[in-house]
């Protein structure tokens, strides 16, 4: 999702997306440790998305 689209979301919707991404990132890490993850870039992409959402949530709360 684009950053502009994320900024238009409500804080509750962003929190739901954040929880989903955190679970997804956890699954990717477990797959990576057990050598089942094919595409390692998924780890970096989810980590970046998590950081973007956290930043937007903090900006909206300030």
UniProtKB/Swiss-Prot annotation:
One Pfam family cited in the UniProt record for this chain: Ribosomal_L29
Alphabetically ordered keywords of this record: Ribonucleoprotein, Ribosomal protein
GO cellular component, one term: ribonucleoprotein complex
GO MF annotation terms: structural constituent of ribosome
Gene Ontology BP annotations: translation
Keyword flag Ribosomal protein: yes
Superkingdom of the source species: Bacteria
InterPro entries xrefs: Ribosomal_uL29 (IPR001854), Ribosomal_uL29_sf (IPR036049)
Family: Belongs to the universal ribosomal protein uL29 family.
Protein name (database record): Large ribosomal subunit protein uL29
Species of origin: Vesicomyosocius okutanii subsp. Calyptogena okutanii (strain HA)
Gene: rpmC
